Amino acid sequence: MLEDEEGLLLPGGKSLHAQNEKELRDVQLQNGYVRTYAKNKYYTGEKLETKIWVGDYTDNGTTDIYAKQSTGINRIAVLRADVDDLGQTFVAGFEKSKKTLSRMATLSRQMSLFFKFHINQILNQGSSSLLSEAGPRKVTIVYSGGDDLFLVGAWNEVIACAIDIHKALEQYAIGALHISAGIGVFPAKYPLSVCAREVEELEQKAKDY
């Protein structure tokens, strides 16, 4: 953020600029520099005040590309998932003497951090399985935040992602939280909005299982 009128205009005579690390170092020396907003970076220091976590992993594929990259049949898969009984965890997950606002706020922040930050690393460093080799997954996150996840990719890669995420959350929460997911396999041209609705029903069936 700078005090000028050359970027995206903000109230108070300030503007927002998108810059790489080298450009940022130069800008920080200017008199009009106000602060930095960093996306998925652990920048710290004076006027480095706001960290923005975004679950935005993608290998820049399209549905057509994902279908061609899949193993066997040329299909994509859509996954929708969320954490089981998270509301109940907030209500009854703490001992009475330890049920404080600060602990509940910390739990909320840590869940958000998993789905907005750690999820990118999980998908970028996928584990080897029968369905996929180790390495970056051939998927794209459509939405990830709170305790919800929606992604699309090559069908075998999406299933491998589900396994990776399940294991990662189990380790992250020391086995205290579990996640349910619905996965649907579709032709590449099938409307994504319809995929989302159909997979939402599968997700609910998984929760009821």
Regions found by a protein language model. Give the residues of each.
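Regulatory/sensor and coupling segments of signal-transduction and defense proteins
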Residues: 1-209
